[in-house]
Design a protein with these regions (language model features):
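The conserved acidic donor/metal-binding loop of glycosyltransferases
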Residues: 2-6
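A conserved hydrophobic position in a structured secondary element of the catalytic/binding core
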Residues: 7, 70, 75, 108
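Conserved donor-nucleotide/metal-binding helix-loop-beta segment in metal-dependent transferases, i.e.
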Residues: 10-28
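Short beta-strand-to-loop element that shapes/binds the nucleotide-sugar donor at the catalytic cleft/hinge
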Residues: 26-42
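A recurrent flexible, glycine/aromatic-enriched loop bordering the glycosyltransferase active site
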Residues: 50-72
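Donor nucleotide-sugar recognition loop
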Residues: 65, 77-96, 100, 105-107, ...
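Active-site donor/metal-binding and catalytic loop motifs
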Residues: 106-126
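Catalytic core of nucleotide-sugar-dependent glycosyltransferases
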Residues: 123-146
Length: 146
């Protein structure tokens, strides 16, 4: 659980309850203070209306490590020595590895956590307020390699 995330007292227990054979990762969807899905799960915004009330769904989409459980099965199957040391973030890489290894990644829509994007890295908020400045810093200072 990242520092910019607020969880409920039962969040992690609910996530652990989803772990079964063949599951690589379990993530809690992130929401803003109004309860709207936010970064990095914008892609799931319309899902709750199409899923007939399902609270947890299997997806091949990328996960963030905002509030994500990596299962023992994934930890044993993945070779973390292969991670590129020049990168800053590995959540996208590892979530893709999980799928590539034949594991299922579960996104819990019914177990949301409050997320304040980039609270620990204020310069990243420039992406939304001053995108040109953000990308200039990202590329010239070689920041935020995914």
């Amino acid at each position: 659980v990242e520092s910019e995330v607020i969880v409920q007292s039962d969040t992690l227990n609910k996530m652990q309850a989803e772990v079964q054979a063949g599951v690589g990762m379990v993530a809690a969807v992130t929401v803003d203070e109004q309860g709207t899905y936010n970064f990095p799960y914008h892609y799931a915004r319309g899902w709750r209306y199409r899923l007939c009330g399902q609270k947890t769904i299997a997806t091949k989409k990328r996960f963030s490590f905002c509030c994500t459980l990596l299962t023992n099965e994934l930890l044993h199957k993945a070779d973390f020595q292969l991670l590129d040391p020049t990168k800053n973030w590995y959540d996208v890489t590892i979530s893709h590895w999980s799928v590539h290894l034949g594991l299922i990644n579960l996104l819990m829509l019914g177990n949301p956590v409050l997320h304040f994007p980039h609270a620990s890295r204020p310069w990243k908020r420039l992406k939304y307020t001053h995108p040109l400045r953000y990308y200039w810093r990202k590329f010239t200072q070689k920041l935020d390699k995914i």
